[in-house]
Curated annotation (Swiss-Prot):
Membrane association type: Multi-pass membrane protein
Name of the protein: Cephalotocin receptor 1
UniProt xrefs under PANTHER family: G-PROTEIN COUPLED RECEPTORS FAMILY 1 PROFILE DOMAIN-CONTAINING PROTEIN, NEUROPEPTIDE RECEPTOR-RELATED G-PROTEIN COUPLED RECEPTOR
Purpose: Acts as a receptor for cephalotocin.
Glycosylation site positions: N18, N27, N33
Family that this chain belongs to: Belongs to the G-protein coupled receptor 1 family. Vasopressin/oxytocin receptor subfamily.
Subcellular localization(s) per the UniProt record: Cell membrane
Length: 397
């Protein structure tokens, strides 16, 4: 998404060009009221276009695989699966309505379209940025209730997931409406193109600051709070579960010894072991699933923060510092990092899916081995009891 400073009497294209294929210099001299001609670094422009094309291809392929996989198991989707689905849709929206128009714009240098198309393109680019953050926040809220308030979370239906995501998208469309009035087709020192108008000049600083706060700072604070509380809850529950597990094991061993002394092992010992084993496995399964979902979304959030931080830092720097190095290869690379977020998310989902499959396979094998050992032990106990009864009968006779 582009931000171009427009002064009341003269045009300076010094700020910004997100995903820009153009490296623009416009050294405006207020004293002489002169503007130097704009030069374009074609090599850097070509590199940016190629980078955006690769990002778009990887984003479409990765998220399409995720959506196809979820569609195949659509009858067994959990709430977490639904949020992954919505995150993938958001990434595709970024690819088609943010990265793709920007790549075309970078190729043509000037915006080739009508005034309505200019406003619509920049509006949808802003919507994509808001939605990427707000859908992540909605996912964090769901995971927070699943971990910290499991009883109330069980009452949540899939419809509530869609409502939360719908609210996130509506806020994105609402907060992006200023784009429809800021951007328009205008004549500048590079020709007729789509550019923003900020008059008076302080409105540029205000608008960029608002975008940074609404898209990056506030969502980051919310995500930090939610995941901080979740990690604390998991840690606290892990300690309590470990203590209760040790207590159950001691209690079970005591019952097992007592049954060997004076009670029937088949009537009590084996059945208690079976029930206890199922209970422990059940609790562990839920805990592992929740922790895994938290780790998954936390990885996505961390990736989002890493990719978007340089972009917003550069935006704020350029808005508030007139001497900011707003051009050059390094600055352009930092801006391009934000485009990587939409193409990395699906691969994070796939990696966690592979680890989940391996964990289930390993747990299944361990359960089979445990069951076999338990059955053999029970059979040996039965044989010993049978031999003991025979010896007692022989002694009586």
């Amino acid at each position: 998404m582009r931000y171009i400073t427009t002064h009341p009497n003269e045009i300076s294209t010094q700020i910004w060009n997100n995903f820009s294929s153009t490296e623009i210099w416009s050294n405006f001299s207020a004293a002489k009221n002169e503007t130097q001609p704009i030069r374009r670094n074609q090599d850097l422009a070509n590199a940016e276009v190629i980078t955006l094309a690769v990002v778009i291809i990887i984003t479409v392929i990765g998220n399409s695989i995720v959506l196809i996989t979820l569609f195949q198991r659509r009858k067994k989707l959990t709430r977490m699966h639904l949020f992954i689905l919505h995150l993938s849709v958001t990434d595709l929206f970024v690819a088609f309505f943010n990265n793709l128009p920007q790549m075309i714009w970078d190729i043509t240098f000037l915006f080739l379209g009508t005034d309505l198309l200019c406003r619509l393109v920049t509006y949808l680019q802003s919507v994509a940025m808001y939605a990427s953050s707000y859908v992540l926040v909605a996912t964090a809220i769901d995971r927070y209730f699943a971990i910290c308030h499991p009883l109330s979370s069980h009452k949540w239906t899939t419809a509530r997931v869609h409502v939360m995501v719908f609210i996130a998208w509506m806020l994105s469309f609402l907060f992006s409406t200023p784009q429809l009035f800021i951007w328009s087709m205008q004549f500048s020192n590079i020709g007729l193109t789509c550019q923003a108008t900020f008059d008076p000049e302080w409105t540029l600083k205000f608008y960029i600051t608002w975008l940074t706060v609404a898209i990056w700072i506030l969502p980051t604070i919310a995500l930090t709070l939610f995941y901080g509380m979740m990690c604390f809850a998991v840690w606290k529950r892990g300690r309590s579960t470990l203590g209760s597990s040790r207590t159950r094991n001691r209690s079970f061993l005591t019952n097992r010894v007592s049954t060997r002394i004076g009670q029937s092992h088949l009537a009590r010992g084996f059945s208690e072991e079976d029930m206890e084993g199922q209970s422990v496995n059940y609790n562990r399964g839920i805990s592992r699933a929740k922790v895994r979902s938290v780790a998954l979304t936390l990885s996505v959030v961390a990736c989002c923060f890493i990719c978007w931080s340089p972009f917003f830092v550069c935006q704020m720097w350029a808005a508030w510092d007139e001497n900011a190095p707003y051009s050059g290869a390094i600055y352009t690379i930092l801006l391009l990092l934000s485009s990587l977020n939409s193409c990395t998310n699906p691969w994070i989902y796939m990696i966690f899916s592979v680890f989940q499959h391996r964990a289930k396979t390993s747990r299944f094998v361990n359960d089979e081995e445990t069951t076999s050992v338990t059955v053999l032990s029970s059979r040996n106990d039965i044989r010993l009891m049978s031999m003991k009864k025979k010896l007692e009968q022989t002694a009586r006779n």
